[in-house]
Amino acid sequence: AARTLGFVCAPALFQRVIIDCIDEPSDVEAYARNRTALTDALAEYGYTYVEPDGAFYLWVKALEPDANAFCERAKKYELLAVPSDSFGMPGWFRLGYCVSYETIVNSLPAWKQLADEYR
């Protein structure tokens, strides 16, 4: 049988640290910058995506019906995407952008090359 490990509640150390951080403002500008760079490029390359309202990832339509096969092909370009079949969205994949801006920019040529394979 499979066993899932996780937190039932936040560890005591996290609870003590969060007391000092709870009133700090959130800086989401980096995520917005990453999202804009990624979505602008993906749209230019012919990808369809769902614009997120607050998440730090995109739902992107795979360029073939089998999202698992598409994500496997993406690995050839050192791109990491999660097929969304297990999220109830076959034919799509999840793409996180909670990385550095440089990582986003450096990935863009690979997303274009991958799209070019399907033309």
Task: Briefly describe each language-model feature range.
Residues 1-119:
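PLP-dependent class I/II
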